[in-house]
UniProtKB/Swiss-Prot annotation:
ATP binds at residues 29-36, 150-153, 187-190. Residues 277-510 are annotated as: Cytidylate kinase. This is Bifunctional pantoate ligase/cytidylate kinase. Keywords: ATP-binding, Cytoplasm, Kinase, Ligase, Multifunctional enzyme, Nucleotide-binding, Pantothenate biosynthesis, Transferase. It comes from Prochlorococcus marinus (strain MIT 9312). In the N-terminal section; belongs to the pantothenate synthetase family. In the C-terminal section; belongs to the cytidylate kinase family. Type 1 subfamily.
Amino acid sequence: MKKVIIRKTEEIKNWRRNINSDINFIPTMGNLHNGHKTLISTAKNANSNVNLVSIFVNPLQFDNKSDLENYPKTIDNDIKISFENGADVIFIPSTEEIYPSDNKNITFLKAPLELSSSLCGLNRIGHFDGVCTVVYKLLNLIKPKNLYLGEKDWQQLLILKNLVLTKKLDVAIKSIPTQRDFDGIPLSSRNVHLSNNERKLIRFFSHELLVAKENFQQEKKINLKEIIQKLSAQKISIEYLEHLHPYTLQESKVEDNISILAGAIRCGETRLIDHVFLMKRSPIIAIDGPAGSGKSTVTQLIAKKLKLLYLDTGAMYRALSWLLIKENIDYKEEKKLQNILKDISIVFKSNTNSQQDVFINNYCVTEEIRSQEISSIVSKISSIKEVREFLVEEQRKIGESGGLVAEGRDIGTTVFPDAELKIFLTASIDERAKRRKSDKKSKDSQEIDLHKLKELIKKRDFEDSNREISPLIKANDAIEIITDGCSINEVVDKIIDLYNDKIPKETQIR
């Protein structure tokens, strides 16, 4: 489409009314750098939407008039950078256009205190109110499908997510990791003010945060006083340095798997922020649900897209069931069962088709465990206390370092109750029976009557939901997704969106 520059709010309204396309919106305050380039190009490469970049230096975000006047303004270069990196439209309103002096109906918003009273909010009184006010105004003018923001301003990102939620705005927030310069400091429009010596100080600050992150991975704890002493020894002026829960911005607790170490320092007249995320282990996605709800297919695709390990716990129970049949062992005989559990090895291996094969005691049983014979007994075997204890322990060993997506019936309640994202995937019995029938047909399995399949699924549901040990139930904090009428890709995309909303992009880099 033709490149467009718009400067008036009435013009942007008219343009919006006449364009029949979804919009990716990238709000900026100008003086664009490589971080902005990445934001714009990420939006451009994500979809076929129209990319709109706004350039507006919002006076409500500044502490004083001097700070506003000194903010770098490079509009001609900003226009060039925006178009070169994928912008289709640039909106460059004046202050009078956004905050007309004769308009008494401007909506001035307040940022939520629970998110704005710590970190930058301690000393920048009213700053986040200004952010909310201008972004809300721009969103109502532009009505975008997606809003692209950087994780460098993590607190601002949380506050804007809250704004979208509380105002019930129909826009999806997409974030990108903090972008860093060649020497490791976060890219910022204010970096142009730094002298060589001041840049060395911010580099030392950012380096110490990374050192703290590395130490945390080993020791699972952090020593704030020690970090502050190191920074103070370099005569670095610390505005704040805090270790907090990344989403509530309250003091981090021992049981938190993920936390944020965030700080702000002053170098001369320039104030700069940086942060790192601290994780005891990589994230875990737990997907539970009844038979035929699509768990296996969905989980495999999610694992592939997010580069996570796929832990098919159901296959582990099926593999054990297969072995008991092969060895002609009566699972009701406790001693024989205990003996065989001592010598069981279940391993997952990738095959040449980029799929996952299941091995039990060196037997590849990927296809065999999906037979109707196995399906008819696996629920009974999985309800045996010794079997569940053994396999749950094996699953937890696999998940000690995280970085996986697991599916089953008790993942979020028993195996990984501390998973970052819990999904309860379900569908009607009719839908699940149709899927099972189609699946069996595609694998050239023996034809099975649809009515019989429904009865088998009902029976399996009852057994799974009523077993004494680890019954199939939805975890209190699980998000239920009903998949009737949804394509596999729609379900996968929804779960990945939920994952991206809960897990910072910076922690997903592998």
